[in-house]
């Protein structure tokens, strides 16, 4: 329990980064296909 206090497990970092990356790419492509990508 004391090991996770100052250090985040690697699988949590990978999962959060993966979800954030997929969401960001999805929003980017959705905006570009909708015509809002140029305004952003």
Swiss-Prot record:
It is a single-pass membrane protein. The chain crosses the membrane at residues 8-28. Keywords: Membrane, Photosynthesis, Photosystem II, Plastid, Reaction center, Transmembrane, Transmembrane helix. One of its GO terms (cellular component) is photosystem II reaction center. It comes from the Eukaryota. Belongs to the PsbJ family. One of the components of the core complex of photosystem II (PSII). PSII is a light-driven water:plastoquinone oxidoreductase that uses light energy to abstract electrons from H(2)O, generating O(2) and a proton gradient subsequently used for ATP formation. It consists of a core antenna complex that captures photons, and an electron transfer chain that converts photonic excitation into a charge separation. PANTHER family: PHOTOSYSTEM II REACTION CENTER PROTEIN J. This is Photosystem II reaction center protein J.
